[in-house]
């Protein structure tokens, strides 16, 4: 069937903008979209069957870069309110160059895994402090990829999860992280700084080209003492099932952890819906963005995904921002410890 153009030419009905838009809406979901839908169904069908994971509160309130900052600057800074996160990259002695900054979804998934392992072993009386700070990564890269929520079957090429994971591990484990907080009163001004090596000692024996093949030796990392202490205190509980569903978007991962933190306080204190301004959220989680309208657009899409995989969460529209309300925790109360607001 055809329709006349204004100049008398004919055009296929399927080429009309309205029909293209309708066809797009009716198109079958992509593989990634179907995986997200399946994950959401599982979580909503049994919301209490959580796979407990944690993130350090400081890394929820100030987050890593979304994209690669490059090597032009000797440090990367994110500031929100009176809190700051500063990252300095490590140096590769073999290549005589910077490892670069950790960025994107993968170092976030690594930090979720690290914080969760720290919480799992922190109270074991049969382990020394050094043993608690030493995390075993295993002999197989494939097994570790599954543990952090990645797909071991994406191949060993440049864009495969294995290659990207190995590169981001180098970036994260060799970096130095600083948390800073300032306090100011009428007569006094103070600042607290905590400078930390992430993993001052590590051994990685995996072959990215053969990720399924086990090595003769275990791979492991030893967390810096101060970094370990920071991870132990006041972690934010999250559901690993949701992390796997959101892993393609660093912004969605950041927003999910932030929503879990906000919702914990809302549910515990039975608060009404809490307002957040887009401008404030952009300063906190979106410093990679330069256009506020673009950030709002991307954050709105990410929040819609978070709402889909968080039963009991409500996101409302408000002038200049949005409201957050929750009727339940992302992780059931009986499985979490109290976090400070």
For the regions a protein language model found, what residue spans apply to each?
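Charged, alpha-helix-forming regions
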Residues: 1-341
């Amino acid at each position: 069937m055809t329709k006349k153009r204004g100049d008398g030419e004919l055009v296929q009905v399927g080429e009309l903008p309205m029909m293209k838009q309708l066809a797009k809406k009716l198109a079958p979901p992509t593989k990634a979209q179907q995986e997200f839908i399946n994950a959401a169904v599982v979580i909503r069908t049994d919301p209490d069957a959580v796979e407990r994971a944690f993130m350090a509160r400081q890394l929820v309130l100030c987050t890593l870069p979304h994209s690669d900052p490059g090597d032009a600057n000797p440090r990367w800074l994110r500031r929100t309110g009176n809190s700051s996160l500063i990252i300095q990259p490590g140096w590769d002695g073999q290549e005589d160059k910077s490892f670069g900054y950790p960025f994107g979804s993968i170092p976030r998934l690594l930090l979720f895994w690290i914080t969760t392992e720290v919480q799992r072993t922190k109270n074991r009386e049969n382990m020394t402090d050094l043993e608690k700070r030493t995390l075993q990564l295993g002999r197989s890269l494939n097994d570790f990829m599954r543990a952090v929520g990645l797909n071991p079957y994406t191949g060993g090429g440049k864009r495969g999860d294995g290659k990207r994971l190995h590169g981001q591990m180098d970036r994260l484990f060799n970096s130095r992280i600083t948390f800073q907080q300032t306090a100011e009163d009428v007569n006094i001004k103070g600042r607290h700084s905590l400078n930390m090596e992430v993993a001052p000692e590590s051994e990685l024996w995996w072959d990215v080209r053969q990720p399924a093949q086990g090595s003769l030796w275990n791979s492991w990392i030893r967390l810096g003492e101060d970094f370990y202490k920071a991870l132990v205190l006041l972690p934010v509980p999250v559901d690993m099932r949701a992390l796997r569903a959101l892993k393609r978007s660093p912004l969605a991962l950041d927003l999910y952890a932030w929503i879990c933190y906000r919702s914990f306080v809302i549910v515990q204190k039975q608060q009404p819906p809490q307002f957040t301004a887009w401008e404030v959220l952009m300063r906190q989680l979106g410093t990679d963005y330069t256009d506020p309208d673009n950030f709002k657009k991307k954050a709105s899409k990410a929040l819609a995904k978070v709402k889909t995989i968080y039963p009991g969460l409500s996101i409302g529209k408000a002038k200049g921002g949005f409201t957050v309300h929750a009727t339940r925790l992302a992780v059931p109360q009986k499985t979490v410890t109290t976090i400070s607001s």
